[in-house]
Structures are given as C-alpha cells and as structure tokens.
Amino acid sequence: MSKVLVLKSSILAGYSQSNQLSDYLVEQWREKHSADEITVRDLAANPIPVLDGELVGALRPSDAPLTPRQQEALALSDELIAELKAHDVIVIAAPMYNFNISTQLKNYFDLVARAGVTFRYTENGPEGLVTGKKAIVITSRGGIHKDGPTDLVTPYLSTFLGFIGITDVKFVFAEGIAYGPEMAAKAQSDAKAAIDSIVAA
C-alpha cells in the first residue's frame, strides 16, 4: 500500500484547471489502487503564513526563546514535514501565475525547506533528506510556455524537489487554457491522458 499526498495551490477553487485535474487523478488513483491512502491538502483554502523576519527565526536552530507566533510556525513546519515524509507519492497541482508558482505553494515550500531536517549541507554540497518519494506535478497555464524561457515553473519545481531529495518527478501540462474553449478542452483531454498513463504505470 502506498500513501499519496495531494497539494492543491490554486486560488480559483472549483474553477481551477489544476484542481480539476488533481481531482481527476485522485479518482483514477482510487480506481486503480483502491488500497492506497490519499491525503489532500488545499493550500489556498488553508493558507500557510508568509515567511518573514520573525518566522524565519523559528526555523533555524537557536537557544533563544520563541514568540507565540514563532511557536505556531515551527509546529506547522514540523507538521508539514512529517506529513511529507509519511507519504510515498507527492502530487502537486501547480498553476502558473505570472510565469511562476502561486504564492500559496511558495509559502508551503518556505516552511518545508529546513536545514538539518529536509536537507543538509555536507563537504560535497547540499544533500536532500526527503528520499524514496515520487512526485507528480500537474501544471496548468493560460498560455503556451512548455520548454520555453517563460516557463519558470518546471525548472523551479525540479530544482526545489531535487534539493530536498525528490528526484523522481513527472510533469503533466495543461496549456493554452486562455486561448478559447476548444483549446482549453484539448488541454484538459491531453492532461487527463497523461495522468491515465502515470496512474496505470
């Protein structure tokens, strides 16, 4: 049995293409792998606090007493990291906003990236500590950006996930959604076909 963590990060709720596609993946996964356990965390419905000067102090080893706000941030960071490490497959629904990931997803990453916990520095360079995972990224875009200089989402997510130890990453693209109903429908259809292939593997 595998455990699957689904991270939604769109601000558009049910209207979101990435949310719809991640819901489709969950449906297909349950159909093909009924014994697996699936956890869904919606980072827009339950937002993560923005990292600031006060909160970053909670995430660094220190003997200094923590403020109540820092204590809350540290407890949430511990919870998010424990959840991440407890799952085998990480599904990230990542819409492109202004060429990059959403603020909601970035805030999550900022609380998950912790030296000595999810990565460490060695004499040979940084080493990721969140290993043995597979990641599936579902990324939706209004325009066409894949393999082009305006796609900052793919390299960023590949770099971040690899940095914390997740190197088995598959991407599903839904592009051209803003180009009209026909293009949007094709984007959904192509993305669902890619999801079907991944789930069946």
From Swiss-Prot:
FMN binds at S10, S16, Q17, S18, M96, Y97, N98, F99, S140, R141, G142, G143. Keywords: Flavoprotein, FMN, NAD, Oxidoreductase. Its EC number is 1.6.5.-, 1.7.1.17. Pfam families: Flavodoxin_2. InterPro entries: Flavodoxin_fold, Flavoprotein-like_sf, FMN-dep_NADH:Q_OxRdtase_AzoR1, NADH:quinone_OxRdtase_FMN_depd. Belongs to the azoreductase type 1 family. Homodimer. This is FMN-dependent NADH:quinone oxidoreductase. It comes from Shigella dysenteriae serotype 1 (strain Sd197). The gene is azoR.
